[in-house]
Amino acid sequence: MKFEPIAIVGQGCVLPGGLSPDELWKTAHEGRDVLGSPPPDYWGVSAAQIVRDEKNAPFFDHTWSDRGGYVRGFDEIFDPRRFLLDADELHGLDPLYLWAVEAARQALESAGWRPGEVPGSAGVVLGNLSYPTKSMTDLAENVWRGSEHGIDWRNRFMSGLPAHVMSNALGLTAGATALDAACASSLYAIKLACDRLHDRTADVMVAGGVNGASDLLLHVGFSALQALSRTGKSRPFHSGADGLVPAEGAAFLVLRRLDDAVADNNTILGVIRAVGLSNDGRGHGLLVPSQEGQERAMRLAYEMAELEPQDISLIECHATGTSRGDLTELMSMARIFHGMVNIPIGSLKSNLGHSITASGAAGAIKVLAAMRAGVRPPTLHVDDPLPFIADSPFRLLTEAEPWVCSGPRRAAINNFGFGGNNAHLLLEEWVEPADKHHSRPNFPVTSAQPDDDIAIVGISLLVGDDETASVADHLKICQPIPSCDGSGTRRARMTEVWLDVTQTRFPPVDLKQTLPQQLALLGAALNIDELIKGLPPDTTSVVVGMGCDAEVTRLGVRWRLADEIDDPDQLAAARDGVVQGWTAAGVVGAMPNIVANRLNRQFDLRGPSFTVSREQLSGTTALEMAARALRRGEVDAAVVGAVDLSCEQVHEAAARVLLGSEEQIPGDAAVVLVLKRADDARRDGDTVLATLPADQEPHGECLHLGTAPGALNLSPLLGHAHAASGLLYVAAGVLYGLLGVWPDGTPWTSEKRAVVIALNALAGQEQQIVLVPPAPKPYDADALGGQFRPAARPQTGKSTRLHFPGHLPDVRLPTHVVGAHSSVSHQEEQPASAAELGMVSAGQPIATIHYRHQSRRTPKDS
């Protein structure tokens, strides 16, 4: 597939040493090192309690260094009156939100547009590290301490909501979503934004990344992985480099189709020629980079751009300062650039550390400035480079030099992330043709979105303690899954997750340290493992809707107790009452992108893979992205999932304030669908469970499901599993079509049928999905059971099942550190109503909805 070039017409950033692109270029060009220690109380616990630089320091509950790349001076340059939202609406939000909206505002204004003035349809794709922010940790701690007064509950939804706030603050109305592909996130975001432009579903896209995750969590986590620099120095490609140094901030680009940018006389900062994406699949492990995976991303980029590696005259490397990672990158590049010499390489991380989900976009801004200045800037701390470089095609830029080359300046930018996520972006300077009408390069132009129907050929559900066939039974007889617990609250709670040890490729000891969120999705996928194992490994993607797991905030609370309890034994006991210490396996088991990438390793799937966060629309947006990639021919199959275990104290507290009444019935769910192009599914002899028509226009007799007005809200039946809720509606629509029944249990036998899923989400986001069920057949319980129930495993006389709790034990804080407001009512403590915050997502209960021409019966309460 050829890549239609995309123009970069705007840029903005909020980064260490770079509160604007000009300031960032000055930092890079002048060779400044802007790393340092955090401001006082930045971590919520004194550094003396956490920093241990001794060689024998334990790997958990401590960090080897507090040095990082910190955003400084932001309050002096941020003006909340510059946005379409009232300044009060931005008050109380975590800095993550504010960095993102400010960097994106800069980018739009550099393109010549103020908020609300962007031409055509404009959207957002945001790379966002879905670890908790400090504000989310504060929120969770207050919930557990029973002191909820004054909480800004929006900080609970820090995975997808920042993109929604960006769209509202800037007047971008063509959809806003976030994703997590670890360190490759911002280049993944740029690629997916280009896809929107290519298929003409948007005219302008704002794309990039932000990292506002808890800096304490990153430092302790990277120490547990033995990846943090003990010296606090970021030294890419140095022979003595001892690890990475985390950084925070945001960086964004404004993108348009090149033809549109030229026609409108936009200032073109550069041109994206291609972005190649891949995953390592099984590779060497979730944390170990793979040459083969990195090479696939690079080769794909050059193939799509119709360029050769020798066209590149600068490489902005991923190079984080980890010896294995840097060497692997050099080795994979050496294969691609074999036979060439003297290729300049560098890394912005030597200046400001590793900004993780923002790093690729930050590198792109650096390269754009270098092209404009005609200067290749230096990389710091490379006085003793890795020996491999001496006989490689590459040379390190130790000082600034003129960027002279025979043709247009072209650069490659690498991003490689945990979980095997790889990205390679090709960037070209824009040279204005002497005659705009006759001297334009002959670039490929992609047509609007191809018209392939997409087939759903596999489905697996876990809802509470029910699996697919049981969920189908509940839908058929209108029997709710949520039931009342001892507190009188109705929940669809998952009490346990079980995995078959003969199926999993992960050591049981590691799985025991993995959060139930990851285990639930893995369990759902393993229930249809034979189907997934038959998919083409090189061209199958994994795209999963999810949100930040609030359980991860327990770690921050665990570490903060060190400032409250002096006695070591009492401190150890108190900490264990919150959560166990973080080991390397525990870090991986809580890593947000691993929710998707664990399936890459399990099934050796090597297509582009990532998690998607759009709050209630997370799973359906994952579905939409996978369908787009299938229609474009970039992949041949996709495993699409969504997971959320919402029966959890912190989420429930936030839901009571910000979500509608139906969405306050918490549910736990994991959903997995398998997609192919419909023609391929028929060729392969797959059973087509439903199709996603290309035109997405409903025809025939329609069943309306969802949370939009006029649709049937299934939360009373299935519970509300927040980030999984949208895809759960899709799965329910598939099941209703296969069962041949309406939700009231009456037969649905029309030849032309459709399911319309209409969804509303936080901050006004909306989405509609249309499904076409197969021709109706008589309901056959045995046939459906055989299709939906996992195949029986051979009996060996010994159980091969591993059982894991569906939730962590309740948080137990010592009485002397529990807040004085532990009995405060949730209702009394709401700082503002959901309506006042503009956050309520609409929806109506089953009893009041006419989801077809005539509603006959409604589910019974239980």
Predicted regions and their residues:
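Compositionally biased, low-complexity intrinsically disordered regions
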Residues: 806, 812-813, 819, 835, ...
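Cationic, low-complexity basic patches in intrinsically disordered or flexible, solvent-exposed regions
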Residues: 831
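Condensing-enzyme catalytic core of the thiolase-fold
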Residues: 1-786, 793, 840, 861
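Polybasic, low-complexity intrinsically disordered segments
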Residues: 818-827, 854, 858
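Basic polycationic patches enriched in arginine
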Residues: 789, 793, 801, 812, ...
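Intrinsic, low-complexity polybasic segments
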Residues: 786-788, 812, 820-825
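Long, low-complexity, intrinsically disordered segments
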Residues: 842, 846-862
